[in-house]
Every structure is written in C-alpha cells, then in structure tokens.
Amino acid sequence: EALSAAVANGEFITATATVNLGGGNFGDTSEFALNTAATVTNIIVVDTTSDDATGSDTSSIAALYANKGADGKISLREAIIAANNTANIDGSTPDEIHFAIPDALIGGAHTISLASALPSILQAVIIDGSTESDFGSTPVIALDGSGAGGSARGIHLNTGSDGSTIRGLAIHSFGDDGIHIVSDENTIIGNFVGTNASGTVELGNGDDGIHINGGANNVIGGSTATDRNIIAGSTSDGIIVQLSTSDGNAILGNYIGTDVTGTLDFGNGAEGIRLLTGVENTRIGGTAAGEGNLIAFSSGIGISVEGSADSNPILGNVIRSNIGLGIDLARDGVTSNDVGDADPGSNNLQNFPVITSAVTDGSSTITIDGSINTTASTTYRVEFFSSTVADPSAYG
C-alpha cells in the first residue's frame, strides 16, 4: 500500500492493527510491528569499509535494502552496482550514495581497500563522502587502489553518467587514473586525488589524476576551499583533457602538485594540466575570487596547450616551481611573437606582452611599461604576476 506522508530518510516505521467493526466502531488492537527504517528510493547508504559484494541482491536499490547479503552491510561496490541498475527518478534525478560507517577512524579515514576496479558508473549518481558523520573540512572516506590491479581506475564516469557529482573522497594508489570521465556536465569537488585523507601524505595514482576523455561541460573544483580538489603525485599528468568533444570544461580553484597547505612538493610526473589537440573552451582559473588554481612542482610543464586546442582561457592562476614553462603553447618551448599575431596553432599561438620596464617604489606602487603586438581591434585582458625568483627560461 502506498501512503502519502512526510517521512525523513532513516526514520523508523512501525504499525498497529485494530479490528474495524464498522460504523465507526473498533475492537482489539495489536502490539506494535517490528520497525523498519524508511529509505529514500534513490539514496543508498554505505555502512562498511568492506569490498564484499557476495550474496546480496544488487538488482536495484530497493532489492539491495531487502537483501544485503550475509554480512547485513552495504559496501560501496554493492551501492554502485545497485545504482547502475536503478533508473533515475523522472529519468533525470541522480541516485545518491551516502556514507554512515560506524567504525572508528584509522589514520583519519574510513579506508575502503579495493580488491579490483570498482564498476564503471553508467548513469547519473552523486557519491558524497561529506555525508559521513566524521567529515570535517577534509575527506574521511578513502579509496585505496593498491590491491585493485594495475589497470584499475578509482572512479570511472562512463557513457550515460552525465550529471554526476563526486564529492569528498580521497582517491589514491590506483594503477590507472584517479578519476576518468567520458560523460558530460559532471561536478568533481572536494576530493583529494593522490594523497591521504588529510592531504598531508603523497600517495599518487599510476597514470593521470583526473582524465577528461571526451566529456563536455564538466566542472573540476570551484571558488571555495570546500570545493577545491587536490590532485597530486600522479605518474603522468595532474589533469588531462583530450578529444574535440571535450568542450566547455572548467578547472577552478584546485591545488595541483602540492599538499593541503599548498606548500609541499607533491608534484605530478608530467604536466600539471594538459589540453590535447581539439580541446576548446576549457577554462583554467577565472576572474572571480577563488577561481584560480595553484599549479606547482610538475616534472614537466605547468599548463600545456597542444595541437589545435584553442579558445582556452587561462586566468588568475598561481603557476610556480614547475620544471618546464609555466604555460607552453604547442608544447615546444617558448614561441616567439609574430607581427600581427596571424600564426595559427595552440590557443592560436596568442602573442605574449612585451614588458620593457617595471619600476617599483618598494611598497605600494609599480609602474610597468610595455606593449602587445596582436590582432587589431580586439580587446585583451592583461594579467601581471610577480615572483621572488625568475623562471630559468626568463619567461615567467
């Protein structure tokens, strides 16, 4: 029987039965029924760090709650399978995976040690580590991929998972990417990719930290400390975006190649951020407060824009202590300016400003003289940066 009433997720439901004698008269009443906890049809609560998925019914969220298997618990693996098998409400509202693990924190985290790769996510889902009651300002749900196999990814947002959110997880020690995205309009916020749950120990992932492979309009990070991702210690790139369908992505407010304080060297093995040929309209940083990324300690380039990738604004970022150039268009070293800026290429090989002098009073005022030789009748935003140490290339 479907009843209409306002009941919160987790409230306990019980009942009595009373003989109806008719005419508004009633007879004997029973005791209270065995209670059951109310569940929201699109919310699954993970309550164990176990990676077990045997014996349970993962054919739907409702089926999983009815049959959790012999351990009586719901693992993250079971939750993802059940969410994949449950149609989104109204065809659009994502299922949600929450956490309520009763065990004490060990090393500041509830660590889920995976024996194999988690299932790919096949439809919209919100995996929200911040729902765990132990959550403070940093993740307490950690996914450890050290035992999952060399090709395992941490989270794989596959085709069909458009509109998903991954929030508040530490994802480390996977053989492949920490997060791999092939779908659109996903939000990745508040995750520590490649560190422990407190963001103080570099653990890395075997390929890229975050890999957008054809996905469009994804948002990585945000303008607040809560939304900031740490992406560190990857064998390859911190963030890589590839394929011409990867249009309109935004990379905002992240710490890339460093720790939670933004000071330690947790550098990625290649580039901090890499945009491959065909990628357009991917915004790295921004003009609003908090949107700039910190990109540091890369073994390669800070930000690399390659091939035919163009119309990719890079704004308001702190780019420092990288082995290669801070920004490298075409990934070939410093590109000389050309008269009129007519040459094509990565970000249209936009000419850089030429600074002829910079005079400071040592406290509050600096006078900068310079010019930019570029496309006529076009408005430009010129950003200035200062550092106590010059880039070895003299550019940056």
Task: Label each PLM-derived region with a short phrase.
Residues S183, G209-I212, I240-T245, G272-L276:
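Tandem-repeat/low-complexity and Cys-motif detector
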Residues G278-N281:
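Short, solvent-exposed linear patches
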Residues S223, D247, T287, D310:
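Short acidic-hydrophobic sequence patches enriched in Asp/Glu that either
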Residues I188-G190, I220-G222, R228, I251-G253, ...:
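A detector of tandem-repeat and repeat-rich interaction/domain scaffolds
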Residues E1-I189, T195-D207, G214, R228-G233, ...:
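N-terminal, post-signal-peptide segments of secreted/periplasmic proteins
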Residues T187, N191, I212-N213, V219, ...:
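Generic alpha-helical hydrophobic packing signal
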